[in-house]
Structure formats: C-alpha cells, structure tokens
C-alpha cells in the first residue's frame, strides 16, 4: 500500500492546526507503531500526547497515512518507505526532514515502548544510531553529489533500522505469543 502524497498530508495537518510537518507526523507514527503502540484511529492524540486532539477524518490523507504505514511495517517484502518532503526538494530540506523524522520517531517510540523494551543487540545499536541522527542538522551536509548519495544511504539505514525495531518490539512478541 502506497503512502499518501506528502502535500495532501501537509494540507490536512494544517487543517487540523498541527504544528508538525508531514515527516514529523510519519516519524512519530512509525515510532509509535514500532514501539508496540496500538493501531487506532486516534493515533494523532497518542503521538502528540494530546488527549484533546481530534482524530483524522476517516479516508483522509492522515488516515491513509496510518493505514499505509501499518501495512508497510507488516509487509513481508520490506516495502516500508519514509514520508519526508516533496520529490525534487533541495538537499537541505531533505536532510532536515529526515532528521525531524528521526526525532519524531524517537518520541513516538518512547511513548509506545515507555520503559526500556527488550531489544536485540542490533536493535539497541539501531536505536542509538537513530538518536545520533536526531541530533544532526542539514549543516552537516554540502550540496555536493556525494552528500546526495550519503543522504540516500542514511535514508536506507533509517528504513532498515525501523523495520528491525518493529521486528523486536512487535513482530517478535507476536510470533512468540503464537508459539505459546
């Protein structure tokens, strides 16, 4: 299932008077789900820690974002994608969006997992690496082609790290529960 267009997510976010970018919303949602948080229509209230937050309109871009993200995280072909910024955005905007995504992921993951979850050694390392990325900024990159390639590699790393953490916190326990 494909993610909705980033512009549609941003538009609906503005309609709900949210201060978060599309990248931050997707990062928070991914963190929430990867940390074991429930897939529910009121996901915005949960990741924003605001019980008064209105649930996204059913069938709207934010609802589609939730549904597609859940499907992608559960996909056996590892089809998970990051929702960052519009295609063709300048390198600084793309790097800022990625680092914002990582910060929001950590927030959502922390809200869902709360106490320290049982992570594999690789999961621990992935979480630490995501925390380091969350501290970075676009100033760490130049507009050179090498940095464009480096950013693509970092995006791929983040994608795999999220799938690993989701596996540790959601898929592993689910599998163990079926065995018992």
UniProtKB/Swiss-Prot annotation:
Put simply, this protein is called UPF0149 protein XCV3523
This protein's GO cellular component annotations are:
cytosol
Q: Which lineage ranks, top first, belong to the organism behind this chain?
A: Bacteria, Pseudomonadati, Pseudomonadota, Gammaproteobacteria, Lysobacterales
Q: Which domain of life does the protein's organism represent? A: Bacteria
Regarding protein family, the annotation reads: Belongs to the UPF0149 family.
Give the originating organism: Xanthomonas euvesicatoria pv. vesicatoria (strain 85-10)
Q: List the disulfide bonds.
A: none
Q: Which Pfam families match?
A: UPF0149 (PF03695)
